[in-house]
Amino acid sequence: MSLQSQNAQNLYIHAIQDGRVAEAQASSVGDTYIQHSTGVPDGKEGFAAFFVDFFKRHPEREIKIVRTIEDGNLVFVHVHQYLNGGEAQWVTTDTFRADENGRIVEHWDVITTSAPNWRLFSSWSYRLPSFPP
């Protein structure tokens, strides 16, 4: 696994799951950090400040990295997050841009809630369309 992929995964596991934001940033984030997530300010300080409240609201965090894909200096990480014993479940897709040293310098994400299958499909029905013979 490349250094930039390791650094992207490190932010998830060490910063978000384990709560070791400063340590993860020191080893994985570049000098500048541009954040495109709603409510999260740019910079290492903004990232760290956001997670102070996040950790209070979600003291139990389990992160499962499903897959990591690279394209040049971009790293895409597909993640399942289980918060507070499954009280909140999120599926996220994150895009990280790395600098020439493999350190993370920019981040985008898409987040959706995840519910058990019975909740998703309990009132949903699907019928195959009719096709001409």
Residue ranges and their predicted role:
Residues 1-133:
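C-terminal and inter-domain tail/linker signature
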